[in-house]
Amino acid sequence: MATIKDVARLAGVSVATVSRVINNSPKASEASRLAVHSAMESLSYHPNANARALAQQTTETVGLVVGDVSDPFFGAMVKAVEQVAYHTGNFLLIGNGYHNEQKERQAIEQLIRHRCAALVVHAKMIPDADLASLMKQMPGMVLINRILPGFENRCIALDDRYGAWLATRHLIQQGHTRIGYLCSNHSISDAEDRLQGYYDALAESGIAANDRLVTFGEPDESGGEQAMTELLGRGRNFTAVACYNDSMAAGAMGVLNDNGIDVPGEISLIGFDDVLVSRYVRPRLTTVRYPIVTMATQAAELALALADNRPLPEITNVFSPTLVRRHSVSTPSLEASHHATSD
C-alpha cells in the first residue's frame, strides 16, 4: 500500500508539500498540486481522510452509511439517526453501500472527507482488517449490525440467528412441521445467520431439514414474490413459511393471495424486522421485531460521544429480537396438512 512518502518521492516534492496539497492549503502552488494529484492517482493513494478532517476541525455533521436508503429497514435507521443529529444540533449526511465492498468503502471515505467526525456505519462486505484500519483512523466511528473483533465496545448488533430460531419455533409451536424458508440471496452474515437459525429450530424439534423448502431471492417485495413462486412450483408440501424479512413476506403474501391460497388458513407466514409494511398487509404480519430505532439511536449517541471525547452513554452491544404476534400465523388446518402430505 502506497504511503505519503511514496507520493512525495514520485511527485518530486517534500512530504510537507504533499500534506499541504491534501489539506488544500493556499501555500501549495498549482504546479505542486498537479504533481501531487498525478502521483496519488498513479499510486492509487488514498490519504487519511480522517487526519485531514481533524486538521481542518470538525463540522457539526453526523455521517451514516446504510445498505440502501430506499429499503424500509434502512429508512427507519436513517430517521432514528437523524433525530439524534437534530436534537444535538448536528446535520446528517448519508451514503449508500448497497452491500458492495467498494461502494461501502467509498461511502465511508466520502463522509470523512466531508468532515464527519461521528459516523454510524452499516457495512457488511468490507473485510475485518480493512474495517479495523478505518476504525483506528476514526475514533468516532460506530458499527451497526456487525461485531468487529477488537472493537466490540463500538459495535451494536442483533442476534439474527436467535431471531430466525424464534420465528421458526413459533411456527413449530403452532403445530407446523413442514416449514419453508425464503432466504436473502445477498452474501452477508444476516442471511447466513437467519438461515442457520431456521435450521437450528428444526433440528431442536427433531424435524429433518429439506433443502427443497428453501428458496432465495432479493430481500425485497419482488424477491419475495419470486422466491414464493419458486417454492410453490416445487409442490405445495408445506403449511408454513418463514421469511428473511418483512418485505419478502409481503411479496410472498401477494403471490399466495393471487393464487387463491388463504393466509393463514392454508399457509401461515412469518416475517422478520417489524417494519411498517408488516402492519398494513392483510392479514397483518406476524413477525420478529428488530429494534432498529433503539439500536440506531444508541449508535448515533455513542458516535457523537466518542467524537467529542465525552463520557460514553450506556448502550447494549448485542440486542435480542422479540416475537410480534399478529394474524398471519395459525395452527395448520386439516386441508393444509392434506395438501402438504399429498403433494
Curated annotation (Swiss-Prot):
<keyword id="KW-0805">Transcription regulation</keyword>
<comment type="pathway">
    <text>Carbohydrate metabolism; galactose metabolism [regulation].</text>
</comment>
<dbReference type="Pfam" id="PF00356">
    <property type="entry name" value="LacI"/>
</dbReference>
<dbReference type="InterPro" id="IPR028082">
    <property type="entry name" value="Peripla_BP_I"/>
</dbReference>
<comment type="function">
    <text>Repressor of the galactose operon. Binds galactose as an inducer.</text>
</comment>
<dbReference type="GO" id="GO:0003700">
    <property type="term" value="F:DNA-binding transcription factor activity"/>
</dbReference>
<dbReference type="Pfam" id="PF13377">
    <property type="entry name" value="Peripla_BP_3"/>
</dbReference>
<dbReference type="InterPro" id="IPR010982">
    <property type="entry name" value="Lambda_DNA-bd_dom_sf"/>
</dbReference>
<keyword id="KW-0119">Carbohydrate metabolism</keyword>
<feature type="domain" description="HTH lacI-type">
    <location>
        <begin position="1"/>
        <end position="56"/>
    </location>
</feature>
<dbReference type="GO" id="GO:0003677">
    <property type="term" value="F:DNA binding"/>
</dbReference>
<dbReference type="GO" id="GO:0006351">
    <property type="term" value="P:DNA-templated transcription"/>
</dbReference>
<keyword id="KW-0678">Repressor</keyword>
<dbReference type="GO" id="GO:0000976">
    <property type="term" value="F:transcription cis-regulatory region binding"/>
</dbReference>
<dbReference type="GO" id="GO:0006355">
    <property type="term" value="P:regulation of DNA-templated transcription"/>
</dbReference>
<keyword id="KW-0299">Galactose metabolism</keyword>
<comment type="subunit">
    <text>Homodimer.</text>
</comment>
<dbReference type="InterPro" id="IPR000843">
    <property type="entry name" value="HTH_LacI"/>
</dbReference>
<keyword id="KW-0804">Transcription</keyword>
<keyword id="KW-0238">DNA-binding</keyword>
<protein>
    <recommendedName>
        <fullName>HTH-type transcriptional regulator GalR</fullName>
    </recommendedName>
</protein>
<dbReference type="InterPro" id="IPR046335">
    <property type="entry name" value="LacI/GalR-like_sensor"/>
</dbReference>
<dbReference type="GO" id="GO:0042802">
    <property type="term" value="F:identical protein binding"/>
</dbReference>
<dbReference type="GO" id="GO:0006012">
    <property type="term" value="P:galactose metabolic process"/>
</dbReference>
<feature type="DNA-binding region" description="H-T-H motif">
    <location>
        <begin position="4"/>
        <end position="23"/>
    </location>
</feature>
